[in-house]
Swiss-Prot record:
Bridged cysteine pairs (disulfide): C26-C85, C129-C188, C228-C290
The keyword Cell membrane belongs to this UniProt entry's keyword annotation: yes
Keywords on record: Cell membrane, Disulfide bond, Glycoprotein, Immunoglobulin domain, Membrane, Secreted, Transmembrane, Transmembrane helix
Annotated PANTHER family: TAPASIN
Region of interest called CH1, as start-end residue ranges on this chain: 5-103
Record protein name field: Ig mu chain C region membrane-bound form
Residue segments, region CH3: 209-309
Pfam families xrefs: C1-set
């Protein structure tokens, strides 16, 4: 039995065609008959549109289905103008509005990396600004130095997409002197339609990291936590890794390593790295080492390490280097630091960095007061 249209589904084209037009469509279904069926399209002013196509109805399960489409200017569609589709027969009609949906804007997080000292020594300074994730795709990178736009010195811009979100990278290249002689920071600004975010980087002399390895408090649980505190270094790029009995932690099942984001304190940086280990391994006397890699450490030194074991009564070895390459101008040092073993209890609060930092200071002062001696051997 013939009846008025019961349903109408609007659809539209993603993007626009090369001719600057967008296709809008309407679908009606479950009709008892397609006799006398017609579509009418109107713009926001109510005027009828003429570039209309109506396809022959197709019979399917549940009744007939019919489709109509119209082409409109992309500028009108992108300008959020509203269009109306109406389907009718002799028994009634149904209409639906079509308007471009407001795009959800996902605001990006920004990361800015600075040149290494090696690159600066070679006369160049490269900055990489990473924005991720964000949407829609439209964005702008703006670089400034001493309030002057230097975006013309961008070497490369890269954009990638993953599951509807975007990642963008902008690479800026300056001469080393532009970077080191400037009293103002290099600024990378990432601009979206309704949101801007920026990061700045100022030049500073490399600062050698101080490294402290904190033993766990006594625990009756199945696991304990070692903490490596790396502080007062510059620049901010640093890598921390762990060894257990001279094996990389990644090769040992059951250990978990976590490192915090770098903390900025007056343009000097700090980081905490924690290693969660089995209590049985700690009680067995296994030796655990925290290794810190930073560009302020000369190539012939490569890293700083701190080692600890629960029951060790022997001096703790602070290993600054293993070899002395012929091309390296610095001397090799091995420092053996003997300290008394002392026990303490402390509750770690992961959410309170200030208390943790004070604990490290306390540990450091105790170590100074109870230090037995320091012997330094210089290997020519």
């Amino acid at each position: 039995v013939q009846s008025a249209p019961k349903s109408l589904f609007p659809v539209w084209q993603c993007g626009s065609a090369s001719d600057g037009l967008v296709t809008l469509g309407c679908v009606t279904r479950d009709l008892a008959s397609a006799d006398g069926l017609s579509f009418i399209w109107k713009d926001a002013s109510g005027s009828a549109l003429t570039d209309v196509v109506q396809y022959p109805a197709v019979q399917a399960t549940g009744g007939y289905t019919s489709v109509s489409h119209v082409r409109v200017k992309a500028s009108d569609w992108n300008g959020n103008k509203k269009f109306t589709c109406e389907v009718k027969n002799g028994l009634g009609s149904k209409d639906a509005s079509l308007q471009k949906p407001v795009e959800r804007e996902l605001h990006a997080s920004l990361l800015l990396t600075t040149p290494t000292q090696t690159e600066i020594d070679n006369g160049t300074a490269t900055f990489v600004c990473l924005a991720t994730p964000f949407s829609p795709k439209s964005h702008t990178f703006k670089w400034t130095l001493e309030k002057t736009d230097i975006s013309n010195k961008v070497k490369e811009n890269i954009v990638s997409q993953n599951k509807g979100n975007f990642t963008a990278i902008s690479v800026l290249e300056l001469s080393a002197s532009e970077w080191t002689s400037s009293t103002s920071p290099v600024k990378c600004e990432f601009q979206q339609k309704n949101h801007n975010v920026f990061k700045e980087a100022s030049y500073g002399n490399p600062e050698f990291p101080k490294v402290y390895l904190l033993a766990p408090p006594e625990s009756s649980g199945e696991s304990v936590t070692l903490t490596c505190y790396v502080k007062d270094f510059y620049p901010k790029e640093v890598a921390v890794s762990w060894l257990v009995n001279d094996k990389q932690v990644e090769e040992v099942v059951g250990y978990e390593q976590n490192t915090t984001a770098v903390i900025d304190r007056n343009n000097l940086f700090s980081v905490y790295s924690q290693l969660i280990i089995k209590t049985a391994d700690w009680n067995s006397g296994s030796v655990f080492s925290c290794l810190v890699y930073h560009e302020s450490i000369k190539d012939c030194v490569r890293h700083i390490s701190r080692s600890i074991a629960k029951d060790s009564k022997t001096p703790t070895l602070v290993n600054l280097t293993l070899t002395n390459p012929q091309s390296c101008s610095c001397s090799t040092y091995v420092c053996i630091w003997s300290t008394e073993i002392f026990h303490y209890e402390m509750e770690m609060d992961d959410d309170n960095m200030a208390n943790t930092a004070l604990t490290f200071v306390f540990l450091f002062l105790i170590t100074l007061f109870y230090s037995i001696g320091v012997t330094v051997f210089k290997v020519k």
